[in-house]
Structures are given as C-alpha cells and as structure tokens.
C-alpha cells in the first residue's frame, strides 16, 4: 500500500510541471513562483542559532543537509518548538539522539517538492495526498484555501507559512508546527 501511495504521489508531482493554459491568461511558470535558487546548501543556509539547525546538528543530520540531495526540508519556525516536549526540547542530550533523528527525518522529503507541486497533488487526489518522508512514514497534505497543510501521524497540522526557498541541494518549506511521526515500535524484550 505504501509503495502504491508513494508511486501515486510521484506521478502526481511529476505531472505538475506540465503547463495547461486552457483557462489561464498567463503561462504557468513554477520557477517564477519559487524564490531564486541560492548557491548554498540547505545546511549552510539555515540559521545556525535556530532550533531546527541545532536539533539537526545534535542528531548529526547537518552533514546530510549539506549533501547532494535533492531534499525538501520542512523546517518548523523556532516558536513551534516551544509546543513540543521530549527529544526535541532536550536535543543536546545524547540519550535522545535516535528519537530526535526519527522526528527530524520525518521533516525531510526526498526530492524537490514545491508548494505548487503539493497543491496539485492534493487537487489530483480529490482533496488530499500522502507524502513520503525520509523516515519511511507519510504525511497527509491538504489545502486550507490557497495554503498547503500537512497532517502528521498523530493529527498535528502544520501549515507551510513561508516556502519554496531553493538551495543548491533542494528546497526549504517553513512550517508553523513540529510534525511528529507515529510512535516507534519497541522490540519485544528477550527472555
């Protein structure tokens, strides 16, 4: 089922770059809608004093975000971190690294996914689209008017509030909520 969902999203997003001008007075130009591409990687462009970068650094993901990509990173605004507890509030604690990594990789999508791509995938999916994350779980994308909203595994809703910030290895989408994956399953205790 997950493979079908991933394939469907890939097809939906892949078809988003086709231009249909039948009901438009101007051509569809996603490149104009996106902010100018920077020559910095995602990691280099993030605020080093920001909560997401600090958490990514603690989890060892800053080197991944400096890698070739492409990635789409859903970066929660700093004030969103005040709403969560657990591994993210105590990101520097080495005991929380595995959980922190699991949560942060839930904020990374493979490939470059623009807001327009998500919106079209939602439209093509009759109101919603499942989006695969790097940790193997999915987010559900919907729309609230013109804004794209992502719902996590526990029901939290994050709106993309500032996005399509292109970098040399992908794109950054800023969201207003920290997204939480489904609880990790624990291996049964050995007797």
Which ranges hold each PLM region?
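C-terminal motif of bacterial Sec signal peptides marking the signal peptidase cleavage site
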Residues: 11-15
């Amino acid at each position: 089922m997950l493979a079908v969902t991933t394939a469907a999203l890939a097809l939906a997003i892949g078809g988003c770059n086709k231009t249909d001008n039948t009901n438009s007075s101007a051509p569809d130009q996603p490149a104009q809608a996106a902010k100018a591409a920077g020559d910095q990687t995602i990691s280099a462009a993030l605020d080093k004093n920001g909560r997401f970068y600090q958490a990514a650094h603690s989890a060892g993901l800053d080197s991944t975000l400096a890698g070739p990509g492409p990635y789409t990173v859903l970066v929660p605004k700093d004030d969103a971190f005040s709403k969560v507890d657990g591994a993210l509030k105590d990101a520097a604690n080495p005991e929380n690294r595995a959980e922190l990594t699991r949560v942060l990789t839930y904020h990374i999508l493979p490939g470059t996914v623009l807001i327009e791509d998500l919106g079209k995938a939602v439209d093509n999916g009759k109101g919603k689209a499942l989006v695969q994350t790097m940790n193997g779980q999915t987010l559900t994308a919907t729309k609230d008017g013109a804004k794209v909203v992502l719902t996590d595994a526990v029901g939290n809703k994050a709106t993309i509030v500032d996005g399509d910030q292109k970098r040399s290895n992908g794109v950054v989408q800023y969201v207003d909520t920290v997204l939480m994956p489904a609880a990790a399953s624990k291996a049964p205790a050995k007797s």
